[in-house]
UniProtKB/Swiss-Prot annotation:
Probably plays a role in the formation and regulation of the tight junction (TJ) paracellular permeability barrier, possibly by linking ZO proteins to the actomyosin cytoskeleton. Transmembrane segments: none annotated. This is Cingulin. A motif (ZIM) lies at residues 41-55. The keyword Coiled coil applies. Belongs to the cingulin family. Residues 117-127 have a biased composition (Low complexity). It comes from Xenopus tropicalis (Western clawed frog). Residues 80-100, 128-145, 220-229, 1241-1259 have a biased composition (Polar residues).
Amino acid sequence: MERDLYGDMADQPIPVGQGVQIRFINDLKENGKPRGKRSKQDSYGVAVRVQGIDGQPFVVLNSGDKAKSSYDYDRHYSERSSTLDTAYSQSSRESAWSRGSQKKTDNGEYPSLGYRSATSQQSTSASNKTNKNGLSTSSFSNQSSEDIDTKPLSSVDSLITKFDVKGQVRGRTARRSQALKDERKRSQSLDGRKNYQDTADSREISLQQQNEVPARRETVSSANRSFARQSLEREDINKTRLTKEWLDQGGEEPVIVKQQRSVQSEFQLKSTPDLLRDQQADGSDPTREMIFSILRDGSTENENNLRKKTSILLEKFPSLQAQPGEDTRSLGSQKKELERKVAELQRQLDDEMKQRMKLESSQGRPKAGMQRLEIQLEESKEECSRLKDLYDKKKNELNAVSQELMEVRMGKEQVETKLRAMEDKLMDSKEELSHLRAKGGTSPDKLALMKELEEVQDELDEVLQIRQKQEELLRQKDRELTALKGALKDEVANHDKDLDRVREQYQNDVQQLRKNMENVSQDQLSLETERQKINQVVRNLQRELEESSDEINQWKEMFQKNKEELRSTKQELLQMKMEKEESEDELKETKDRFSLLQSELEQAKKGSVDPGELASVRKELQRVQDQLKQLSVDKQKVEENLHQRERELSALKGALKEEVAGRGRETERLREQLQSEVVQFKKDNENLGRESQRIQDQLKQVLLEKQRHEEAVHQRERELSALKGALKDEVSGRDREAERLRAQFEQDAMQTKRSYEELVKINKRLESEKVDLERVRQVIENNLQESREENDDLRRKILGLEAQLKETNTFCDDLQRAESRLKDKITKLETERKRMEDTLGEAADQEQELAFVKRDLGNKLEEAQRSLKRLSLEYEELQECYQEEMKQKDHLKKTKNELEEQKRLLDKSMDKLTRELDNMSNESRGSLQVLQSQLEEFREKSRREIGEAQKQAKEKTAEAERHQFNSSRMQEEVQKLKLALQELQVEKETVELDKQMVTQRLQNLEQDTESKKRVQDDRSRQVKVLEDKLKRMEAELDEEKNTVELLSDRINRSREQMEQQRAELMQERARGQDLECDKISLERQNKDLKGRLANMEGQQKPSVNVSHLEAKLQDIQERLQSEEREKATLLSTNRKLERKLKELNIQLEDERLHVNDQKDQLNLRVKALKRQVDEAEEEIERLEGLRKKAVREMEEQQELNEQLQTRLKTMEKESKRKPIRPAHNDDDDLSSDGEYGGSYDPSSITSLLTESNLQTSSC
């Protein structure tokens, strides 16, 4: 409703009204009698008519108590002054009702929160009310952010042409018409009235007097008040910890409570008792009745004419017929929506705190990424609170400036009331003169009185002319002020919309950040579970490796046992061989004997046969046959033992085969499991990389959103500074109009300037914090880059492990092939065994072939020995392969430990970074708290000074009123002298205030220089810290270079060792070839000897050389065995050397890879160090530029200080030299021309203000 009354009425093209009419009811007199004492201190009633922008009258109803209200109504320009006066008196009666309704809300709101008392609102006027209403209504509009005008403010003339198109002249063009006596009596009847007291009795009396007020509206207003009280109680219950801290820190109302209070005040203003009084029970238009009652009071016209005039006014202004129900419903819905939003935000905050508590309880030590995000969230919250504080401060300063403007306007109105009182006195004197003329008579006293009256009339004409000029100036100033107020209103509305939009956007960003934090926490938990799974798998693999090592040890023990058994069987075989040789010798001896016996028998047959000898020969033959039988039995036993040993050997071979097959299956299973774990590890690593990239993108988005917020805040601050500039111009104009309040305004201007400088400092600090955040972000990005490089190193190591796995697979294949070869050899041995069995069967049947069987057995034994040697060698190779596998497992364990060590180092570095970030945030918080405390102290001090100045101003106004009341009874000469004295005192006070202002400015400049010195010292300390960091980095770089040199020395030494091993290997190979040649020659000799032996045995002729040859053959066999043993030892040593060479090659390759990795890491670290050095150099250059800039600013401030000091000295000299003006120039103490002759003309004031603006801009 108020928007329609204020906005739509301003759009109608109505003729511009004339003048400003103000009447203090308590100052009116009746028949020249002095007014009586006031019934109560500071109690008065005032009716003010101020002409609006487009001719719209604006009425302020004010009283001395704590309430205030304002209404708009339309009037014709052609109404005469008597109607205006009566309308004002009627409106003053209506103000009592508005005070009664308003006081209830002012005293009922927030009784225990310690907010500002309502006494500071006594001097506010209608323009402030309209501005506040405009702000409250425009804050709920849905305009977009593109409608904001970011261009600089236009000039005052363009604003006047924008808001005031019509060019008619305001003010009175003629003298004020004489007021009727009954109207003055009516005004005098209001003087003795007491102030309206908001008690139950007064409300009952007022309600009895106003019978037209329907009961329905009272129930609605009481319901609204109860609803507002309940909502406030709910809000007080739902307040959070932050809100309580805000309430404990200061008396400022929160923004939401202010909005609710403005909504409640608007809702209550729409149902004030004076409007309810004029509403009829039959549902007639209250606006029509109000306009009719205004026109009817003090008018002598007919009622029908007045009705026609009201209808014409309503036709011209259709916006007055707005329905209040929709507005109140919309305000109620908006209030409910605000309450719902506050409850929802409170609920979200509680949920977030619960989630954070759960996360902290579940997670013992938060990770570095989570800590960074929490730190950024806390910094964004602190930045939001700082922005809110700045917004509240600016809003409070704007309200204070508007209140001070209203106080200036009230002072102007008081001056105008004094002028009207003088006019009333003149009218009374004219009436007395007319009465005297009517009576007749020309006495000399009457002639003297006539002359005095004519002189007084001439003086009054001069005063009126001066007053008309002053009104013309004031009219122009009012038009400028209204234009500026319109522009200010639009700017403030747009600013509030932008702030609401920024607040909503910030809330959305905070919610998005919370969601991102929850997602990060969930991802972190999932990563933790995956890491636990991987650790479990690694532990299982370690356990399996330990079990496999235990099994390998058991197999080694079994193999050792089998080896010992084989050695024992070999010894037994050798013994059996020796026994067989003995038996063969015996058999030879028996054969020799048998041949001798045969020869003897033949000789005996040839000769004479002796029966004794024949019996002895037969006995000898029987004995030889028995020996042969015994030898055959022994041979069977030996054969049985051989069969048993072969069976044991085949069983051992089968067990060994099964063992090798089991080990192959186990290695295959381990290989598959390791491959699956490697694939899973790769997947987890890729997920970690993607997660880190996503977190980095989220951090970039948060930083971009923060930059946008900071840009919006800077834009709002620029707009506020522009608005402050307009307000300063307005304040300087009002200071020229009201000289008495200039000091207070200048102090307020200085305070706003200091607050602006503090805001600029805070802004710089915010920029520095932004730079620090950028630096921290770069550090985080570098750490992420390092983590990616480490992930690449891990991938390379995993590839190396896969290559090692492939080598183990190939080794397993080689083992399987060796196993197949062993199987073939075993089959060959079995076939040979069968063949040996056949030959042994034939030897049992034919004793003649014992020699051939003996040779075959010898050959087979030799082959068995060679096979046993080969088996033992293959077993040793297998054992060496197992040892190599164990070494590879140890190497894998070492690489795993190195990876864990690197991970621990990474965790330590991340913890160190988080601690540094915490320290930086704590330092920034501490500095911010110190600045806030200093700012609060400065504000308290300025408030106390303003309160003292206001008290002094009130005391001075009271003294001025007393002097004025006494001066009305004194003569004109005394009054002129007193006025001259007052002007001198005012000028002296202005000079003193100017001096104080200059001293304060000097103090501020000194403080600025000290702060800049401190900043310079801090920057020098930062430069020193950066230099120390550079030195530290250079030392680390030297250490890394030394480590690289040591690694290169180790590589050279290992290469030399490899060359030595190769030379030894070549020597061993040459020796092996020589031994092979010797072996081949010995085998040839052996074959020759065996052939010769076979020929000798085939001849069946005993010879003396047989034994010699057999001994020689045995020696040759022993030499051959010893050479074979030496050859076996040489082969084993050769294999060992080859294995060592392979190991050295592998070790060299690993060291080369390790050196390359370290070289890459060192290159990356060198690049990072160079980048840090470049950043440090850039930071040093930037600090040097800032230092130079600060020095230049300090020099400029010193120059300004010197200029101000010279200006102050010249002003003091001019104030001392200035003489007292003559009395005839000081007739009118309220003329605005008197202040142009002083030491402060408008040009000097504007120059000072421009200098202050220049100073703030340079800061």
